[in-house]
């Protein structure tokens, strides 16, 4: 059908005709261009050779739209399969919608949806997102495939050693040793920061180093070496299990600790002599194990031993101490508290052979008369003693003066509880002359003959003025004396300050 009015047909509507009549006006409406969101219901119009417009029937327009829909669906499926060619798609669009610069499109009746699937072209955001997601999935799959062999152990496996092959890098002993070493150091450091003691050999499964035992044979071997460095037993059952499991293997620990095992004796602990190689031992401790002693033949190899802790032992005596001390040139810490069978003879032998000794505790509640000033003098002359425990011993004022003159500058901790022979002519006078300038801890409980604490309090005030912490621990009587002396010194200081200020003000008035 050909319409008679060519102007109307040229512009598409009467409104367009009205706009075209004022084409040269500055307020003229711009020509609408084709966009991907424009409606194409009327794109079936074609220009005839006579210059008039021919409109196809409505059924033809629907068929044209149907063909366009098929084209775009095919393009979308190619894009999703990764076979899309941007250049080819652009040509398809140009072929499907032929336009010329002079051709004008009619105003659409309705606006299509912006996210219509028909317009998922390479230039659209939806298509770009689809391609990007496909590429990311592909990369992730490649990463998972490439690094799948780097798993240490198969978590689904119920056996100790996994049947899954681990990456070769985790089977190099040097690398495994560095990893386990760092875990071991971190675990020990955390225990020290939290104030925890070293765990028992039968440790919980939460231990990081213990968990490394189940990784592989290489990891098991390396981890055992670190776990065997520090052996501590708090129950007799754990010690028995250890002896039964390691009956044929030698271990070289750096520390061996038996803690409060009164039911263990030398007969049922002979397996330790077979299993333990003492060459690397630095810390040997039998804490409150009254019926067991380390074998004497061990000490011939214990040249590296630095700590020997045997408190509450009923078997140790001077003969045993004299035999072992000659093999302990590097001993630094000796704890023989409540070892009632030790006398001056044993301590003098220790002072003679153990030149590196810095801490010695020989305090006791019974047989205090067995330790006298001879032991104190031997330690003061021959060792580098800094911490000395003499609680309950038969110490006199003369021995304290010997200690102060020989090594008073080195003493940092001094325990003199229940040393009933000490009087005001020893400690109070020594503090008055500042014989212990580096003393930080002083224990003077239950010393009946000490009544003058004035110089101790002044020493304490002097330490505080230098911001150096100091602890003077006494019984109730001595504590009250110290508090009263502090109050009097403070009152005297205020009185002196008031007097000086008054004198200064009066001098200003006279001038």
UniProtKB/Swiss-Prot annotation:
Gene Ontology terms for molecular function: small GTPase binding
GO annotation terms (biological process): cell division; mitotic spindle assembly checkpoint signaling; mitotic spindle orientation checkpoint signaling; negative regulation of septum digestion after cytokinesis; protein-containing complex disassembly; SCF-dependent proteasomal ubiquitin-dependent protein catabolic process
InterPro entries for the chain: Leu-rich_rpt (IPR001611), Leu-rich_rpt_Cys-con_subtyp (IPR006553), LRR_dom_sf (IPR032675)
Sorted UniProt keywords: Cell cycle, Cell division, Cytoplasm, Mitosis, Nucleus
Biased composition (Polar residues): 45-58
Gene Ontology cellular component terms for the protein in this record: cellular bud; cytoplasm; nucleus; SCF ubiquitin ligase complex
Region (Disordered): 27-58, 99-119
Subcellular location(s) of the protein: Cytoplasm; Nucleus
One Pfam family from the record: LRR_6
Record field: compositional bias (Low complexity): 99-112
Function: Negative regulator of the mitotic exit network (MEN), required for multiple cell cycle checkpoints. Required for daughter cell separation and chromosome stability. Involved in copper sensitivity.
Family recorded in the similarity comment: Belongs to the AMN1 family.
Protein name, as recorded: Antagonist of mitotic exit network protein 1
Species whose genome carries this gene: Candida glabrata (strain ATCC 2001 / BCRC 20586 / JCM 3761 / NBRC 0622 / NRRL Y-65 / CBS 138) (Yeast)
């Amino acid at each position: 059908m050909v319409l008679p009015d060519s102007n109307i047909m040229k512009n598409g509507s009467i409104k367009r005709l009205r706009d075209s009549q004022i084409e040269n006006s500055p307020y003229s409406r711009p020509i609408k261009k084709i966009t991907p969101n424009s409606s194409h219901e009327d794109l079936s119009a074609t220009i005839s050779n006579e210059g008039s417009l021919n409109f196809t029937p409505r059924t033809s327009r629907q068929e044209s739209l149907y063909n366009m829909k098929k084209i775009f669906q095919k393009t979308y499926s190619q894009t999703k399969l990764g076979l899309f060619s941007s250049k080819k798609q652009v040509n398809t669009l140009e072929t499907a919608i032929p336009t010329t610069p002079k051709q004008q499109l009619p105003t659409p009746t309705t606006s299509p949806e912006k996210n219509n699937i028909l317009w998922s072209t390479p230039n659209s955001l939806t298509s770009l997102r689809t391609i990007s997601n496909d590429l990311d999935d592909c990369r992730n799959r490649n990463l998972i495939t490439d690094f799948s062999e780097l798993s240490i152990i198969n978590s689904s496996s119920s056996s100790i050693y996994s049947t899954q092959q681990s990456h070769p890098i985790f089977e190099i002993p040097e690398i495994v040793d560095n990893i386990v070493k760092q875990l071991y150091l971190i675990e020990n450091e955390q225990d020290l920061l939290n104030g925890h003691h070293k765990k028992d050999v039968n440790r919980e499964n939460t231990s990081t180093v213990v968990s490394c035992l189940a990784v592989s044979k290489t990891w098991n071997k390396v981890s055992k070496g670190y776990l065997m460095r520090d052996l501590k037993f708090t129950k007799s059952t754990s010690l028995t299990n250890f002896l039964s499991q390691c009956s044929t293997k030698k271990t070289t620990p750096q520390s061996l600790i038996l803690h409060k095992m009164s039911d263990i004796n030398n007969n049922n602990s002979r397996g330790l002599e077979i299993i333990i190689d003492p060459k690397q031992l630095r810390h040997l401790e039998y804490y409150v194990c009254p019926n067991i002693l380390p074998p004497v033949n061990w000490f011939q190899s214990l040249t590296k031993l630095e700590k020997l802790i045997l408190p509450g032992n009923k078997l140790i005596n001077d003969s045993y101490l004299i035999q072992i001390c000659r093999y302990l040139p590097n001993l630094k810490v000796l704890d023989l508290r409540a070892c009632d069978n030790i006398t001056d003879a044993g301590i003098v032998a220790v002072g003679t052979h153990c030149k590196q000794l810095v801490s010695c505790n020989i305090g006791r509640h019974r047989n205090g008369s067995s330790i006298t000033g001879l032991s104190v003098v031997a330690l003061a002359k021959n060792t580098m003693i800094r911490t000395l425990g003499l609680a309950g011993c038969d110490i006199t004022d003369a021995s304290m003066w010997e200690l102060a003159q020989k090594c008073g500058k080195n003493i940092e901790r001094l325990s003199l509880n229940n040393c009933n022979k000490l009087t005001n002519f020893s400690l109070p006078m020594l503090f008055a002359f500042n014989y212990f300038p580096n003393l930080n801890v002083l224990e003077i409980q239950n010393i009946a003959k000490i009544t003058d604490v004035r110089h101790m309090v002044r020493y304490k005030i002097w330490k505080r003025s230098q911001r150096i912490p100091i602890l003077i621990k006494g019984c109730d009587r001595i504590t009250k004396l110290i508090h009263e002396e502090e109050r009097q010194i403070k009152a005297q200081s205020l009185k002196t300050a008031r007097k000086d200020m008054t004198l200064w003000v009066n001098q200003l008035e006279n001038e």
